[in-house]
């Protein structure tokens, strides 16, 4: 297997957005492949038995990191467990892998090998989350903000406004995905980024000049921009009704003067740090247990793949034998009018054996014993 990947560790989110794969075009060009794309990760998985032209892949994915073989497989198992995520142990990636895999299967773009790898990755991700505590507690400022809002005020059937669609806003979005929220609105100065994030949340994007209307509509407001100036000032929040505002931006998005309004509860990043730091440490302590699961399941996967390889070799060999049998039988049928049956059968059996022996000898002359034992010589001997 080969993986091409680009993620938040190497590129900022605006750059990743420009690197996103056009999946319609991708699946038209390649077979035996699966694309997994999220707001902070772009990855494509290839079965290299089918996609043997690696130069073509490398040219199409300039700027992407490349992983092959064992490294690619281990990487994918870690991804499914949330070990490679912006939020350690996050749950959303497992659902995104399932959705991506299902799409590729519906398009008939997977292979028997990729089916085994993806089903195993999904199983490993499920084990990690049920047998360890890798996904428990809020570990980012973004998820801590959502946890605080839910714990103190409840989010069920609430309207939430997220101001900011950058890195921190994305973390908030990931946490919101798990909640039963009535509606989510995303506002950002760059409307296209708001639109992209809103789509993932199944929410609605608004232009910044419609911020006042969005505030009036919302029950909870989470501010997470990178603006050097206040986004919400006291005069912006006059007569807006009861609001919960959680400001996790640095520098601050909300003027502290809004605390003067009795109908507004304002929380800042300082209220959340202790929550996220403590939970992150708990998750880090679970990493060895998850790695043990990955090691166990990797060994199981390799045995499954070895079985698949043997079955494919036997299938190819049977096809090879059938091809020779058919050709020699055609010759025998042509001779049936001029020779007796015993002579025809004698010639047929000798020709059949000679063809197999000839192909094997021709290939083995210049092949080492080890390579010969590991090769499908009948393919090369044709």
Swiss-Prot record:
Family per UniProt? Belongs to the glutamyl-tRNA reductase family.
Locate the residues binding substrate: 38-41, 85, 90-92, 96
Site (Important for activity) found at: 75
The record's comment about this protein's domains reads:
Possesses an unusual extended V-shaped dimeric structure with each monomer consisting of three distinct domains arranged along a curved 'spinal' alpha-helix. The N-terminal catalytic domain specifically recognizes the glutamate moiety of the substrate. The second domain is the NADPH-binding domain, and the third C-terminal domain is responsible for dimerization.
- What EC number is given for this enzyme? 1.2.1.70
An example Pfam family from this entry, by short name, is GlutR_N
InterPro entries found in the cross-reference section: 4pyrrol_synth_GluRdtase, 4pyrrol_synth_GluRdtase_dimer, 4pyrrol_synth_GluRdtase_N, GluRdtase_CS, GluRdtase_dimer_dom_sf, GluRdtase_N_sf, NAD(P)-bd_dom_sf, Shikm_DH/Glu-tRNA_Rdtase
Give the binding site residues for NADP(+).
164-169
Residue numbers annotated as active site: 39
* Keywords assigned by UniProt, alphabetized: NADP, Oxidoreductase, Porphyrin biosynthesis
Q: Name one GO molecular function term.
A: glutamyl-tRNA reductase activity
In its UniProt entry, what is this protein called?
Glutamyl-tRNA reductase
Query: Which reaction(s) does the protein catalyse, per the Swiss-Prot or TrEMBL entry?
Result: (S)-4-amino-5-oxopentanoate + tRNA(Glu) + NADP(+) = L-glutamyl-tRNA(Glu) + NADPH + H(+)
The task this protein performs is described as: Catalyzes the NADPH-dependent reduction of glutamyl-tRNA(Glu) to glutamate 1-semialdehyde (GSA).
Q: Which gene encodes it?
A: hemA
List the GO biological process terms: protoporphyrinogen IX biosynthetic process from glutamate
Specify the pathway.
Porphyrin-containing compound metabolism; protoporphyrin-IX biosynthesis; 5-aminolevulinate from L-glutamyl-tRNA(Glu): step 1/2
User: What additional remark is attached to this entry?
Assistant: During catalysis, the active site Cys acts as a nucleophile attacking the alpha-carbonyl group of tRNA-bound glutamate with the formation of a thioester intermediate between enzyme and glutamate, and the concomitant release of tRNA(Glu). The thioester intermediate is finally reduced by direct hydride transfer from NADPH, to form the product GSA.
Subunit info here reads:
Homodimer.
């Amino acid at each position: 297997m080969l993986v091409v990947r680009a993620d938040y560790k190497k590129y900022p989110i605006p750059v990743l957005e420009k690197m996103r794969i056009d999946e319609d075009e991708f699946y038209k060009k390649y077979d035996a492949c699966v694309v997994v794309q999220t707001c902070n990760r772009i990855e494509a998985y290839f079965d290299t038995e089918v996609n043997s032209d690696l130069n073509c892949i490398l040219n199409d994915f300039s700027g992407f990191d490349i992983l092959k073989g064992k490294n690619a497989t281990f990487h994918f198992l870690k991804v499914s467990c949330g070990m490679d995520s912006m939020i350690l142990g996050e749950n959303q990636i497992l659902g995104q892998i399932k959705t991506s895999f299902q799409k590729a299967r519906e398009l008939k773009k997977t292979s028997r090998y990729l089916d085994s790898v993806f089903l195993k990755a999904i199983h490993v991700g499920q084990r990690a989350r049920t047998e360890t505590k890798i996904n428990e507690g809020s570990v980012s400022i973004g998820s801590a903000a959502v946890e605080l809002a839910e714990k103190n005020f409840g989010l069920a059937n609430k309207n939430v406004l997220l101001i900011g669609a950058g890195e921190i806003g994305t973390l908030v979005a990931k946490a919101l995905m798990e909640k039963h929220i009535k509606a989510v609105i995303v506002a950002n100065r760059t409307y296209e980024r708001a639109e992209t994030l809103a789509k993932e949340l199944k929410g609605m994007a608004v232009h910044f000049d419609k911020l006042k209307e969005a505030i009036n509509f919302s029950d909870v407001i989470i501010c997470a921009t990178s603006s050097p100036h206040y986004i919400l000032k006291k005069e912006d929040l006059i007569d807006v009704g009861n609001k919960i505002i959680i400001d996790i931006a640095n520098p601050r998005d909300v003027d502290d003067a809004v605390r003067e309004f009795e109908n507004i509860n304002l929380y800042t990043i300082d209220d959340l740090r202790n929550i996220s730091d403590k939970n992150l440490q708990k998750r880090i302590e679970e990493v060895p247990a998850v790695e043990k699961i990955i090691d166990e399941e990797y060994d199981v996967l390799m045995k499954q793949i070895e079985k698949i390889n043997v079955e494919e070799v036997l299938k190819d060999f049977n096809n090879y034998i059938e091809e020779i049998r058919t050709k020699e039988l055609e010759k025998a049928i042509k001779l049936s009018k001029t020779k007796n049956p015993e002579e025809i059968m004698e010639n047929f059996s000798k020709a059949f054996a000679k063809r197999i022996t000839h192909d094997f000898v021709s290939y083995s002359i210049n092949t080492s014993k080890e390579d010969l034992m590991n090769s499908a010589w009948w393919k090369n001997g044709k």
